[in-house]
C-alpha cells in the first residue's frame, strides 16, 4: 500500500512542522524561494494548510523567525544556567554557547541570512529582529551587571559583545577551517576581558 501524499496531524504539531519546513526552505533555497507551495511541499502538506494555520507565507516566516530565535535563546539560557553562580563563568558560557551546536550550525546560519535579507523589506521581520536582539542585549546587560560593570557602560558593552559574537559566529560557520570554535571563544574572551577592565 502506498503512503498518502499528505498527512494529518494535531494543529500544534502541524504548525511546528510548517515552521520547521519553512526554516529548511529558507536555509536551502533562500527567502525568494520561500513560497506557500515550496513550504507545503517540504512539509508534505497541501498549500491550503499554510493559509489555514498562518494566513499566508509572511506570517509563517514571522513565526519561523520567532521559533528560531527562541531556540537560540533557549540554548544561551541553558548554557548560562549550567555555568553555576560565578558571574564571569556565566558570561563566558553565554558567549561560548554561540560557538557550539545548536547555534554554531551552517543550516542555522543560512536561515539567519535569509531572515536578515527580509529585515529591510518586511517591517514585521524588522520589528521581530529588533525585539529579539534587544532581548539578547538585555540578557548580556544582566550578565555584565553581575560582573560589576558600571551601569553607564553596560548598554554599549552589550552592543559590542553582540556584534563581536555575531561576527565571529558568522566567520566560524562560513569558514570553519579559518576560524574554529576554540579560537572564536579565545578572541571573544580577550575582547570581553578588555571591556570589563
Regions found by a protein language model. Give the residues of each.
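Helix-turn-helix
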Residues: 17, 21-63
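Hydrophobic alpha-helical connector segments
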Residues: 63, 77-108, 157-161
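N-terminal intrinsically disordered/low-complexity leader segments
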Residues: 1-13, 24
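Hydrophobic/aromatic residues within well-ordered alpha-helical segments
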Residues: 14, 57, 64, 68, ...
Amino acid at each position: 500500500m502506498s503512503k498518502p501524499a499528505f498527512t494529518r496531524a494535531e494543529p500544534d504539531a502541524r504548525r511546528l512542522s510548517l515552521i520547521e519546513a519553512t526554516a529548511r526552505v529558507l536555509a536551502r533555497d533562500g527567502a525568494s524561494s520561500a513560497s506557500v507551495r515550496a513550504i507545503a511541499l517540504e512539509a508534505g502538506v497541501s498549500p491550503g494548510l499554510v493559509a489555514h494555520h498562518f494566513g499566508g507565507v509572511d506570517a509563517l516566516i514571522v513565526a519561523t523567525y520567532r521559533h528560531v530565535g527562541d531556540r537560540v535563546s533557549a540554548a544561551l539560557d541553558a548554557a548560562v544556567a549550567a555555568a553555576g553562580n560565578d558571574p564571569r563563568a556565566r558570561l563566558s558560557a553565554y558567549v561560548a554557547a554561540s560557538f557550539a551546536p545548536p547555534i554554531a550550525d551552517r543550516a542555522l546560519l543560512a536561515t539567519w541570512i535569509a531572515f536578515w535579507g527580509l529585515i529591510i523589506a518586511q517591517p514585521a521581520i524588522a520589528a521581530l529582529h529588533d525585539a529579539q536582539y534587544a532581548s539578547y542585549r538585555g540578557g548580556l546587560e544582566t550578565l555584565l551587571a553581575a560582573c560589576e560593570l558600571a551601569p553607564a557602560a553596560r548598554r554599549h558593552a552589550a552592543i559590542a559583545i553582540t556584534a563581536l559574537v555575531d561576527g565571529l559566529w558568522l566567520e566560524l560557520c562560513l569558514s570553519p577551517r579559518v576560524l574554529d570554535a576554540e579560537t572564536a571563544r579565545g578572541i571573544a574572551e580577550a575582547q570581553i576581558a578588555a571591556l570589563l577592565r
